[in-house]
């Protein structure tokens, strides 16, 4: 414990006070190459702590697919500006499941592709099921 106390009370303050931090903004332009090299280690430590903190508190809701594109629709009718399907309810036999994850190969009907999508992204999307009464 004494070694930790020595580092915190003596070594670290001595190291920080010996760093060539200028008093004015213009002083940054007068630093030599050796002074800039001396500032790299503490800057790297501060950046590393900032990055680790950012990753620790980064919301899990912002995860994207393995492809990393962030798009919902990656392959269904990309030549159209907006994908819209009109389905007459009278044409549905008993019930129909419609895709909401855009991963199906049988568009607009669900083929269960959302299971892999949910596993990859942590999402919980499922189909829209329409039944006849």
UniProtKB/Swiss-Prot annotation:
Lumenal side, ranges: 1-35
Top-level taxon of origin: Eukaryota
GO molecular function, a single term: metal ion binding
Chief location category: endoplasmic reticulum
Gene3D superfamilies hit by this protein: CDGSH iron-sulfur domain, mitoNEET-type
GO biological process: intracellular iron ion homeostasis; mitochondrial transport; regulation of autophagy
Short name of any one Pfam family annotated for the protein: zf-CDGSH
Coiled-coil region: none
GO cellular component: endoplasmic reticulum membrane; mitochondrial outer membrane
Localisation: Endoplasmic reticulum membrane
Topological domain ranges for the Cytoplasmic compartment: 59-133
Keyword Transmembrane: yes
Cofactor binding note of this UniProt entry: Binds 1 [2Fe-2S] cluster.
Keywords recorded for this protein, A-Z: 2Fe-2S, Endoplasmic reticulum, Iron, Iron-sulfur, Membrane, Metal-binding, Transmembrane, Transmembrane helix
Chain residues that bind [2Fe-2S] cluster: 99, 101, 110, 114
Membrane topology note: Single-pass membrane protein
Cofactor dependency: [2Fe-2S] cluster
Membrane spanning stretches: 36-58
The family this protein is said to belong to: Belongs to the CISD protein family. CISD2 subfamily.
Official protein name in the record: CDGSH iron-sulfur domain-containing protein 2 homolog
Organism: Drosophila virilis
Gene expressing this chain: Cisd2
